[in-house]
């Protein structure tokens, strides 16, 4: 059976197996026989034909719902070369999770996603993006607002004017942009829109300067903070598809008693006029470039071979029966395109040898040549 016929059947058979394990043997039909279901298949570009030709043909023959979208990406490289398990040129997820926050990797991979062209993973870029974009832009804004609010208004905050009109308009535009990008599986574009909105929030916060307002007009400062807390709420919802754990953590700090994953997507546009915050902690910890490069950079290449067997002695070498022969005849192998049949004279009976040199040497190149045989 052709491997790509059997492989894609795993989508279907796994769902049946899952349904049986749930004690609901017909539950799989909700996806495969439901006209309202939408199938998405995420992969690299080399697997496109199997999911756009072979798999749809199989589904059509069975009368099942066809794929809705096949959002294939270009390649993700590691230090400008392809990942390879055999060469140990890879990032091993268990090792990564032992050392780092998984949400950092989610953010980084989404930010460099190879949607239009190959992308390159480097540890230097990983640290730089996490520190400057995720922490310096997004994480810093949320922590600045929440920590300042809890420090200066520990009893809670209330305002009859909870919406900053300029920020609210930018949030609506970003919400539309993020929504369209996610629906089109353009995750990098969606994340970029969120980060642009966060940067706009940082600029607006610096302009509002609540640290100055609190000294001159506490009521105005309270209104400013309520507006920015609502803005942080919107950011948390928008970021939740990318960073579910830290988004929920921020949601909890904002005094919410719900789960973001249970909310509707439109809750990103909701506002409230009062907050009772919990004492926040920074959502992320800044990375140390030197420490990470020391841990993650591959060791310098060496010419030493691992597990080399000891050399044989000359006495052992003399025991080998090595004979020199002359190629007298070359024929094509009747059943293989890459093999030659060689008749070789070693000074006695002519030996027939099969060799994989066809395609490398022509017939005339081999005739009369000498070779050694053990």
Which functions belong to the PLM regions below?
Residues 195, 199-374:
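Basic, alpha-helical terminal appendages of large translation-related enzymes
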Residues 118-123, 172-180:
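Short, charged/polar, low-complexity loop and linker segments
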Residues 25, 52, 90-93, 102, ...:
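Alpha-helix initiation and N-capping motif
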Residues 44-47, 85, 96-97, 126-137, ...:
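Secondary-structure capping and boundary motifs in well-ordered enzyme cores
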Residues 7-10, 137-148, 170, 177, ...:
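Alpha-helical scaffold segments in carbohydrate-active enzymes
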Residues 74-76, 125-126, 160-165, 196, ...:
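A glycine-rich phosphate-binding loop feature that marks nucleotide/adenosyl-phosphate handling sites
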Residues 17-28, 142-178, 198-217, 299:
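Conserved, charged catalytic cores of large soluble enzymes
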Residues 1-151, 192-194:
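Structured secondary-structure scaffolds
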